[in-house]
Amino acid sequence: MKYTSLFAAACFAAISLQTDQSFAQDADEPVSQCLAIAQTMPKVIFASLDANPLDLKGDVTITYAGHSTYRIESPQGVVAATDFSGIYGTEPTMPRIVTMNRAHSSHHTLSPDPAIEYVLAGWNDMSTGPIDHDLVVDDVYVRNVATDIRSFGDGMIADGNSIFIFETAGLCIGHLGHLHHALTDDHFAQIGRLDILMVPVDGGLTLSHQAMADLTRRLRSSIVLPMHLRGNSISSFISRMGPDWDSIFLKGNTITVSVNSLPKQPTIMVPRSLGRSGGFSDF
């Protein structure tokens, strides 16, 4: 297991940082396919001996596991699980990569399974400033954009959450995490293009449905996958997206998608188990 951050605060036990440099490469660094303007990317941690691991072909399988956890499986079989707490996302196989956020215990774990190779925390306990992830594992590139979270008292905790972006098979897949504020132009520039967006739709613990809908419309992703549902709030979020967005309730919890199969009209796709928890059973 390789850790890229420490949990060390009053509420969090420390986990030691381990970085296996045996896989580090000085070869060409990957360039994000999601950024509109090419920039020099920061140094990345390679987890593959392939000097040019990013492939633009193949299908990506995305499965809703529960709460805020989606499993993303690349064409080469690399599995990443989002906002991983250890409760969801471990079946049928343990993911190689997990991302976590610190807002609540349902979004992280202090004791990830040792079989997980890469544990990416969305916050930085080692120093001031945002955590910065740039990780390549075979055909998957993972990076993050830091945002703030509300503290348990007044005010905000700077850089306490991360939007994680997964690039594989030419697709740009973003997970907003436990987002607590509107995004700035700088955030949008760092995020770039997102073909698939995983968005919290609780309507209160993160952002209001209106604020989340406004943000989602600006990102203009081809597929929107809801998560972090409370009560019947999915219908409230969908209604605020407006007529330019289609919505479908999936027959299962899994979609398979490629660059060529993205819908022409932006579409909200509600996984079966999420829809059922939101009071929709006739599908």
Predicted regions and their residues:
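Cleavable N-terminal signal peptides
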Residues: 10-12, 22
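A Lys-centered signature of the CheY-like receiver
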Residues: 227
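Residue-level detector of transmembrane insertion/anchoring sites
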Residues: 8-10, 168
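Metallo-beta-lactamase
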Residues: 5, 18-148, 173-176, 195, ...
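Bacterial N-terminal signal peptides that target proteins for export
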Residues: 1-8
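Active-site-proximal loop/helix segments of hydrolase catalytic cores
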Residues: 148-219, 230-236, 240
